[in-house]
């Protein structure tokens, strides 16, 4: 009987993987000045990057129009701010799908509809309770219009985990595990969707460059390995460790067969003076190795998910100079904001050797001086600065403790000083996790 059950599991597993094939796409963000037009961007995605799928952060009709009659698989997104509206109204959800998705479905290969972006990282905790109800409503709306091929999901960062090391001890944060994540996993499992994950080995490596090998983080061939004491599984790169930590967290909540999709990954091609290893050479190396590994047939999977097909999107198409935060946030692009390549990468995985000569790394050691994330000179939008200050302070109670009246770093009537302090504190903590 056990043999029969095993055969059934293997057959089902094969059928599941047959529905998807190893594909690496690219995230197409729009937070930059003078970016190429949507039509030119799509041309670059297809010819320069050779990507098979693309993910955008809204449902911009100008961009969706550029995807008409292409072979690109497309992922679109519902913005965080309208999640409560969808959660509370099926008619609102139906209307949104009818006017943002339905007009393009005959000519654009929309395959994923994502509800929000990193909602469970947001300091707006009231939003969390609206997430899963919104996902359910959106799925009903898609079914209403017979759009059965579109999977519903939501991207999560690595900070949804309470524990990620060793991988076998992966677990979700206690404030979200039972009330939000478990119902979400149940929905994703029943609808045969994915756990969408934003995962960046750069950030944990940059926090511990003396303890984590750079080659291990870049997926280079190396003798460095790590053996999980709980499972005996051997790891040869940091990304596999991070993916399996999420897999075990999902498994421990009762969903061992739920598939993972990498919604974002990448390596910064530049950054601030204290952001070690953020350079073109490392970015090219990581993304090239990633593309080769995640387009391989048969699929490699991970130590805990051998042979698993893991669809993925690299971040990002362009450098985006309007993104807030540390310098790395604006420098994940494979292309410059004008469309010129920062380096060559073939996301189809077909190119094994590259002709371009990569520049030598200049920031291979940790910066010894002091560095701050500050409000840029010349910024006059005080409302935007207040919003940034409020956002940073709301993320954790302790971030802005020292700039309260009577504390060491308080300066009366100095909004810019307080905002700079808060942003520095916020980003120094956020970059300690890999997503």
Regions found by a protein language model. Give the residues of each.
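Substrate-binding cleft of extracellular glycoside hydrolase catalytic domains
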Residues: 64-176, 262
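Terminal membrane/secretory targeting segments in land-plant proteins
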Residues: 1-26, 362-368
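Active-site mouth loops of central-metabolism enzymes
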Residues: 21-36, 86-87, 170-175, 372-382
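Short, acidic/polar
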Residues: 29-45, 90-103, 178-182, 384-388
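Substrate-binding and catalytic surfaces of secreted/luminal carbohydrate-active proteins
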Residues: 136-140, 148-153, 161, 176-430
């Amino acid at each position: 009987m056990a043999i029969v059950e095993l055969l059934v599991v293997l057959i089902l597993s094969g059928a599941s993987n047959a529905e998807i094939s190893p594909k690496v796409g690219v995230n197409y963000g729009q937070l930059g000045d003078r970016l190429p037009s949507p039509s030119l961007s799509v041309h670059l995605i297809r010819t320069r990057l050779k990507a098979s799928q693309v993910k955008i952060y809204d449902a911009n009709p100008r961009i969706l129009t550029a995807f008409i009659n292409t072979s690109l698989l497309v992922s679109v997104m519902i913005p965080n701010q309208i999640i409560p509206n969808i959660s509370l109204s099926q008619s609102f959800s139906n209307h949104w799908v009818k006017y943002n998705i339905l007009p393009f479905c005959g000519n654009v290969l929309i395959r994923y509809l994502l509800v929000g972006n990193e909602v469970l990282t947001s300091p707006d905790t009231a939003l969390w309770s609206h997430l899963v109800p919104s996902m359910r409503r959106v799925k009903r709306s898609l079914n209403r219009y017979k759009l059965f091929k579109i999977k519903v999901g939501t991207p999560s960062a690595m900070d949804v985990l309470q524990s990620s090391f060793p991988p076998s001890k992966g677990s979700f944060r206690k404030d979200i595990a039972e009330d939000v994540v478990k119902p979400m996993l149940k929905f994703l499992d029943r609808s045969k969707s994915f756990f969408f994950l934003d995962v960046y080995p750069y950030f944990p490596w940059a926090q511990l460059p003396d303890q984590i090998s750079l080659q291990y983080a870049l997926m280079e061939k190396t003798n460095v390995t790590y053996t999980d004491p709980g499972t005996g599984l051997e790891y040869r790169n940091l990304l596999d460790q991070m993916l399996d930590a999420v897999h075990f967290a999902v498994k421990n909540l009762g969903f061992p067969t739920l598939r993972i999709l990498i919604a974002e990954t990448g390596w910064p091609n530049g950054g601030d003076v204290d952001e070690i290893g953020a350079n073109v050479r490392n970015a090219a190396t990581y993304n090239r190795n990633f593309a080769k590994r995640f387009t391989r047939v048969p699929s490699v999977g991970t130590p805990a998910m051998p042979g698993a097909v893991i669809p993925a999107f690299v971040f990002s198409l362009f450098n985006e100079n309007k993104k807030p935060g540390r310098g790395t946030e604006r420098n994940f692009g494979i292309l410059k904001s004008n469309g010129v390549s920062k380096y060559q990468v073939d996301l189809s995985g077909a190119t094994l050797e590259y002709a371009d000569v990569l520049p030598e790394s200049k920031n291979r050691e940790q910066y010894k001086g002091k560095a701050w994330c500050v409000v840029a000179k010349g910024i006059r939008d005080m409302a935007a600065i207040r919003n940034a200050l409020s956002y940073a302070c709301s993320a954790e109670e302790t971030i802005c403790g020292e700039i309260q009246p009577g504390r060491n770093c308080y300066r009366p009537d100095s909004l810019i000083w307080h905002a700079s302090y808060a942003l520095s504190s916020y980003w120094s903590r956020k970059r300690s996790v890999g997503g």
